[in-house]
A protein has these predicted regions:
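Short alpha-helical "recognition helix" segments of helix-turn-helix
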Residues: 82, 87-101
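Short Lys/Arg-enriched helix C-cap and helix-to-coil transition segments
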Residues: 115-138
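General nucleic-acid-binding
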Residues: 1-48
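Short, amphipathic alpha-helical "recognition" segments used to contact nucleic acids or chromatin
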Residues: 61-88
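Short, amphipathic alpha-helical segments that act as regulatory/interfacial helices
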Residues: 16-19, 23, 68-75, 109
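Helix-turn-helix/homeodomain-like alpha-helical modules used for DNA recognition
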Residues: 145-148
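Major-groove recognition helix of helix-turn-helix-like DNA-binding domains
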Residues: 99-116
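Short, Lys/Arg-enriched N-terminal segment that forms or immediately precedes the first helix
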Residues: 45-59
Length: 148
């Protein structure tokens, strides 16, 4: 009989921990940006900061992957851990990149493994993301101290 009560207490503890983890996941996966109208502005910033420009024929696959990661960080952080891309983001990026289908954007998700594997790639993305964050704060688009 004592064992059954101990198991119920353990079950209760597990349930409480799952609720706490779900709340934390929700907080961490909440996007900093939700308004898709900012994506072209962010693209312009990316072109400026990375040294690429539309006159040179647009972005190569590596640059598109970098920009995608930055967009996912701001608009769909859950995607960076295997979740789905937030509705509307793929369509906007497909149009921006000149893709015929939004599914082509999903093919760029290899950039996530590049980010995890290659230190130089990660450093570049982190620097760009930090600069974007500074500019978004300066422009009042996100609060000075967002909850992460």
């Amino acid at each position: 009989m004592l064992q059954e009560f101990l198991e119920i207490e353990e079950l209760k503890s597990i349930h409480e921990e799952k609720l706490r983890l779900m709340e934390r996941e929700m907080a961490l996966s909440t996007p900093l940006l939700t308004e898709l109208e900012y994506i072209p502005m962010l693209y312009k910033w990316y072109c400026e900061l990375s040294g690429c420009c539309e006159e040179s024929g647009g972005l190569n696959a590596n640059q598109k992957g970098q920009f995608l990661l930055i967009i996912l960080f701001f608009y769909s952080p859950i995607t960076l851990v295997g979740g789905r891309i937030v509705n509307g983001v793929r369509d906007r990026l497909a149009k921006l990149f000149g893709f015929n289908s939004p599914s082509a954007v999903s093919n760029l998700r290899d950039a996530i493994s590049f980010y995890e594997t290659y230190k130089g790639y990660r450093k570049t993305i982190d620097q760009l993301r930090d600069e974007f964050m500074s500019r978004l704060k300066e422009n009042g688009i996100i609060p000075q101290n967002p909850i992460l």
